[in-house]
Structure formats: structure tokens, C-alpha cells
């Protein structure tokens, strides 16, 4: 893990759960924290058993559906967080609008959450493209669409 990124987290962190070795076990721990009323933080990415895609800056954004699945199963609210480095070297942190869905189907739920996230993320990436580290989660519109069982 990057010490620059984890330095501030470590001041407030109860526990770090890594999915590097066992994603299923990590998700169980996160679900338990939610069931206990805790807050969790998940970095958006495309590592997971299922992906959902949404239109994004003329292409598509492909993300793992683990966070939406946890939110749906537990009733938790997803609050996206956007962090930008300011000119003076400090960081500006913005908590976005809650990502919500009334979809009863888990795949439709995840797709709607990813679409809302993509819509909220787009202005930050458009205005601060040099600071975004998620380009690897994007694809051109003409690339192959996901099938229902895609994995990272």
C-alpha cells in the first residue's frame, strides 16, 4: 500500500481490510462492519467477480459491483468521495451526493449506482484529468461490451 495515501487514513482507521488475497473473506468482514453500524471505505476499481459499465466522457467506465452489492444487501448509503490536490499541496475533499437506487434486481441496482457515480465523477476528471488515477477503468465506446459474468 502506498504510504502517501495511507498516512492520513491511519490516523482514523479502525481496521484495514485487504482483498488482495481473499476477496470473499474481505467482503464478509466489510458486511459485518456494516451490520454493526460501522462506516467502510472502498476504493472504486474494476477488480471483482462482476463489473458494471456506464457512459463516461465519451467512452465507458467499468467498475466492480462489490460496493453496490454491499450497499443493497445491508441498506447502507454510498457516499462518493472526491479528493483533489490543491496548488499549495494540500488536499480538497468533497463528499458527493448519495448514490441510490430503487431497483430490485441486483444487476440493475449496480448498473444504476455505477451510472450515478460516473455522472458525478465526470466533471472532476474533465477538470483535473492529470490527478485521476482511474483511466485503466475506462474503455472506448467501440470496445467489446461486458457479458453478464465478466470479471477483472
PLM features: what roles do these ranges have?
Residues 10-11, 23-152:
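Non-catalytic C-terminal accessory region of glycerolipid acyltransferases
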Amino acid at each position: 500500500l502506498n504510504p502517501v495515501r495511507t498516512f492520513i487514513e491511519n490516523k482514523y482507521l479502525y481496521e484495514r481490510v485487504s482483498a488482495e488475497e481473499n476477496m470473499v473473506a474481505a467482503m464478509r468482514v466489510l458486511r459485518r462492519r456494516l451490520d454493526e453500524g460501522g462506516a467502510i471505505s472502498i476504493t472504486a476499481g474494476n477488480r471483482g467477480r462482476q463489473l458494471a459499465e456506464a457512459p463516461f466522457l465519451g467512452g465507458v467506465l467499468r467498475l466492480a459491483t462489490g460496493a453496490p452489492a454491499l450497499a443493497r444487501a445491508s441498506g447502507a448509503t454510498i457516499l462518493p468521495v472526491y479528493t483533489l490536490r490543491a496548488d499549495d499541496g494540500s488536499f480538497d475533499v468533497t463528499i458527493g451526493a448519495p448514490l441510490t437506487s430503487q431497483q430490485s434486481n441486483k444487476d440493475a441496482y449496480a448498473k444504476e449506482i455505477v451510472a450515478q457515480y460516473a455522472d458525478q465523477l465526470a466533471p472532476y476528471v474533465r477538470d483535473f484529468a492529470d490527478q485521476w488515477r482511474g483511466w485503466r477503468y475506462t474503455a472506448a465506446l467501440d470496445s467489446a461490451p461486458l457479458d453478464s459474468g465478466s470479471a477483472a
